[in-house]
Amino acid sequence: MIIAVDVDGGDYAPKEIIKGALKAAQEYKIGLILLGKKEVIHVHAGHYLKKYPIEIVHCPQTITFNEHAVEAIKGKPKSAIVIGTSLVKQGKADAFISAGNTGAVLAAAFFILGKIDGVERPALGAIITTRPHIPSLLIDAGANAECRPNHLDEFAHLGNIYAKQVLGLEKPRIGLLNNGEEEAKGTKLTLETHQLLKKSQLNFIGNIEGHDISLNKADVIVTDGFTGNVVLKTLEGLGDALLKLRKVGHAIDSAAHLRGRALLADVGLGSMVKGMDFEECGGACLLGVKGTVIVAHGRSHARAIKNAIGLAKRTAEKGVDKLIAEDVRLRTLTATEGEQNHVTTPV
């Protein structure tokens, strides 16, 4: 298993990215391809380069966060994002992860790897854990701001496969994020999507509301990328706030500190904080492209990168992209046969 890692991307690149990659090489026993400035990688990796199966690919160009995605990947073919994605395309890497410009990573995946045949809109699936050891998948977490009902239906099928393979769920519960549980409530988008999901073979449990996310009512939470990204960032912000609250408890006097600890134990805030910590999972997987691509958070430190590499390893080992391709093929075949069965022969 070889994972290509963009060491140029992220607020704390390259030091934290390289540090996390080295931890991953040690823990997961995998090979790495580090993509970035060769001399910089040598400075931060040092003797570890001989200790682990690590290859360096020099990338003289860097795509920054404020660059236009498509223009960047076309104008900077020697950047880590373009080269890393190309390595997956060529079969020289099993997966690629980057904490860099998300739009550029998505664009590179679309143009270089290509969409799986039959998939119209690849989507970002983000694993979230609001209850101890009970993860769920939020899809789309930010790849598609504007969607049609058939796109959300597609996201549900992508998420279903990912939840089965990576989360280990036999029959994932699919929930449609809405402003009410009632079937007749919602926007034109959610109303029409609801009807599509009802007709599907998925384990669709109906609409779920925002508060249901923290109650783990659904294993796969389906929504458009705009809403999904807002939800994801809200959970991250809540996690940060709870973490600060916890730190305040450690900073005050002993008696109050004990009361704070008791409160945390009573309501399980400690576990909740851990679950809402984006570094715990590491990144979101781009589902629907021909290969494994993990988008890590721009604020990723070493721990997040290590975990993102672990997620990439699990996703690639399960062959999620190939399973999605087969699922799309079978559903298309079934739909075609159904249409043919409804064709009447003129008398």
Curated annotation (Swiss-Prot):
Transferase found in the keyword field: yes
GO cellular component terms, semicolon-separated: cytoplasm
Q: What biological function has been recorded for the protein in this entry?
A: Catalyzes the reversible formation of acyl-phosphate (acyl-PO(4)) from acyl-[acyl-carrier-protein] (acyl-ACP). This enzyme utilizes acyl-ACP as fatty acyl donor, but not acyl-CoA.
What family does the entry list? Answer: Belongs to the PlsX family.
Q: What is its EC number?
A: 2.3.1.274
- Kindly provide the name given to this protein in its UniProt entry: Phosphate acyltransferase
Task: Write out the entry's keywords from A to Z.
Answer: Cytoplasm, Lipid biosynthesis, Lipid metabolism, Phospholipid biosynthesis, Phospholipid metabolism, Transferase
Q: Which reaction does it catalyse?
A: a fatty acyl-[ACP] + phosphate = an acyl phosphate + holo-[ACP]
Write down the Pfam families for this protein, in alphabetical order: FA_synthesis (PF02504)
Query: GO: which molecular function terms?
Result: phosphate:acyl-[acyl carrier protein] acyltransferase activity
Under the heading HAMAP family, the entry gives: PlsX
Description of how the protein assembles with itself and partners: Homodimer. Probably interacts with PlsY.
UniProt-annotated location(s): Cytoplasm
The pathway entry for this protein reads as: Lipid metabolism; phospholipid metabolism
- Provide the coiled-coil residue spans: none
NCBIfam families for this protein: plsX
Q: Which SUPFAM superfamilies match?
A: Isocitrate/Isopropylmalate dehydrogenase-like (SSF53659)
Name the domain of life.
Answer: Bacteria
One of this protein's GO BP terms? fatty acid biosynthetic process
User: InterPro entries of this UniProt entry?
Assistant: FA_synthesis, Phospholipid_synth_PlsX-like
